[in-house]
Amino acid sequence: IYIDPPYGIKYGSNFQPFINRKPNQTIDKEEDLTAEPEMIRAFRDTWELGTHSYLAYLRDRLLLSRELLHSSGSIFVQISDENLHLVRCLLDEVFGARNFMSIIAYRTKIPLGTKYLASIYDYIVWFAKDKECVKFRKLYDDRKSGEGTQFNKVRLPSLREVPFKDFDDSLENLPVGASVFRATDLVSSGLTESCVFEFALDGKVYKPKSGKSWKTNSSGMARAIRARRVLHGKAMPSYRFELSDFPVQEYANVWTSTQGATDKGYVVETSDRVIERCLLMTTDPGDLVLDPTCGGGTTAYVAEKWGRRWITCDTSRVAIT
């Protein structure tokens, strides 16, 4: 389930949700609608009783979502930093704090000069129906190389090491047989007795400090030395980790590549790639996806694109079905 509710209570709207209306009370008559199409704001964000109305609205949808979720299912609630803390508490109440999975921060804009700190991230609060049996698939992104990253050195076929910037930080400019790498620590953060030993590299003897050990045993270290992967350091040796060894890395809970997307149809529409990652992490082809806050239909579009079944709905009176 992917929910993209209104972010807060501060924006104006043509339609006001009332939570204390009396039976048969008529509100929002058709004749009250403005004649100017641009004044009809479908994506409303205003509440009669302020935060109380907002949380009551969201809690109703979360309670229903909990009943609809499969035991291996997940729910993602998109929100800004204004009400992130309130939404997290609400999800704790409805789904149980034990089923909290993560808060994902994804970049939406570039800082444009604000009085205080610019807010350039929105958030997705992820909960499982049951964390013990939640469906999850790790996603990977290409590792970055060049200036500003750890992969900033090149080993030439002649075994000489030069900065990657000498090749304009472009893999296409590298000569055949060259490799991009970074130096990583050979000392483990803990202590493993079988990995405590001395070894010699070009006549220099190395031994881990007291209470520490190497990240591999003696036979593993010997293989690394034969492969010319062990490098001299000022005090301790390091390991030459080449970009080609594992050219991808797992996505964590901070997504920076979501800013600047050109697939938006209106200002508050969620980028395809944000919903795409959530779906690919937690569903398989043929699984059913629900979005009770359909809006522009981005969730349905992404679900259809990746072979998921989908249901969407919208409470706006100007929604088109």
Can you describe what each PLM-predicted range is?
Residues 1-288, 320:
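Class I S-adenosyl-L-methionine
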